[in-house]
């Protein structure tokens, strides 16, 4: 389905990003596994992709740093020569109530979760416009639609991603580049596993399908959006939340 397409997945060393990278590879894509800290985990993902008979490289880059992002794009093109798919997945949390939130907690989340999406989108557009094709998939969150107490920075960033997705889609459509977002709900990862059991139980009550999502529930939708099956979709945000927000 994605044979010999080149995909960049940011924050791909673990969790949802790892699942996305592996799912794209299973569909035939070669993958750039971006990471910012855990090189060993990123290399494990690369090895798994290579075991499928696909090509992969791990590239360290802080997505909030435009120079890092440009270097990642240069390395990608030197190895693969095209960039067909960008998945903006990298993200962090620094939760706190508004009245207690420190400026660096706000800035860190906005810089990674929103500015990082802008930096990577900007960096790939020239190549995708030259190719007259491309797929950009941005990972937002259901809380970017609904809001969530104690996460003003994260919610603002993820809501911003939805707006950026729409503007990017309108700007790039004439060059056959689609831009869509996904809004996952409560997905079981090492990040969410740290939440207290009572918090998890309360979340579960809000989900009509009565279970937490798995990373594969998210990655399968990303793979669809990267495929020809989604060629007439752009500017959309797909909820992957078990019906939590309707």
From Swiss-Prot:
Source domain of life: Bacteria
Pfam families in UniProt: adh_short_C2 (PF13561)
Pathway info: Lipid metabolism; fatty acid biosynthesis
Active site: 154 (proton acceptor)
Residues reported in the UniProt entry to bind substrate: 141
Alphabetical keyword list: Fatty acid biosynthesis, Fatty acid metabolism, Lipid biosynthesis, Lipid metabolism, NADP, Oxidoreductase
InterPro entries reported in the protein's UniProt record: 3oxo_ACP_reduc, NAD(P)-bd_dom_sf, SDR, SDR_fam
Entries under SUPFAM superfamilies matching the protein: NAD(P)-binding Rossmann-fold domains
Assigned EC number: 1.1.1.100
Disulphide-bridged cysteine pairs: none
Entry keyword Lipid metabolism: yes
CDD domains on file: BKR_SDR_c (cd05333)
EC class of the enzyme, as a word: oxidoreductase
Binding site for NADP(+): 11-14, 36, 62-63, 89, 154-158, 187
A GO molecular-function annotation: oxidoreductase activity, acting on the CH-OH group of donors, NAD or NADP as acceptor
GO biological process per UniProt: fatty acid elongation
Catalytic activity, reaction form: a (3R)-hydroxyacyl-[ACP] + NADP(+) = a 3-oxoacyl-[ACP] + NADPH + H(+)
Entry keyword Electron transport: no
PANTHER family, alphabetized: 3-OXOACYL-(ACYL-CARRIER-PROTEIN) REDUCTASE (PTHR42879), 3-OXOACYL-[ACYL-CARRIER-PROTEIN] REDUCTASE FABG (PTHR42879:SF2)
Family per record: Belongs to the short-chain dehydrogenases/reductases (SDR) family.
Protein role: Catalyzes the NADPH-dependent reduction of beta-ketoacyl-ACP substrates to beta-hydroxyacyl-ACP products, the first reductive step in the elongation cycle of fatty acid biosynthesis.
Subunit structure: Homotetramer.
Protein name listed in UniProt: 3-oxoacyl-[acyl-carrier-protein] reductase FabG
Gene it is expressed from: fabG
């Amino acid at each position: 389905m994605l044979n010999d397409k080149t995909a960049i997945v940011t924050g791909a060393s673990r969790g949802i990003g790892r699942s996305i990278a592996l799912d794209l590879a299973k569909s035939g894509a070669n993958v750039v596994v971006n990471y910012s800290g855990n090189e060993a985990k990123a290399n494990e993902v690369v090895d798994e992709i290579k075991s499928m008979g696909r090509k992969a490289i791990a590239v360290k880059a802080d997505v909030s740093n435009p120079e890092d992002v440009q270097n990642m794009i240069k390395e990608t093109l030197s190895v693969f020569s095209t960039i067909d798919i960008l998945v903006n997945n990298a993200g962090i949390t620094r939760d706190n109530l508004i009245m207690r939130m420190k400026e660096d907690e706000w800035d860190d989340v906005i810089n990674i979760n929103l500015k990082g999406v802008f930096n990577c989108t900007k960096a790939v557009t020239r190549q995708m416009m030259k190719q007259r094709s491309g797929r950009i998939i941005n990972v937002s969150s259901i809380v970017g639609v609904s809001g969530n107490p104690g996460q003003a920075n994260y919610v603002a960033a993820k809501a911003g991603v939805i707006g950026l997705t729409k503007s990017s889609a309108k700007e790039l459509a004439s060059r056959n580049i689609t831009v869509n977002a996904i809004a996952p709900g409560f997905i079981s990862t090492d990040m969410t596993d740290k939440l207290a059991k009572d918090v998890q139980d309360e979340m579960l009550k809000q989900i009509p399908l009565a279970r937490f999502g798995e990373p594969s529930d998210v990655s399968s939708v990303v793979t669809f959006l990267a495929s020809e099956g989604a060629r007439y979709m752009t500017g959309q945000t797909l909820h992957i939340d078990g019906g939590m927000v309707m």
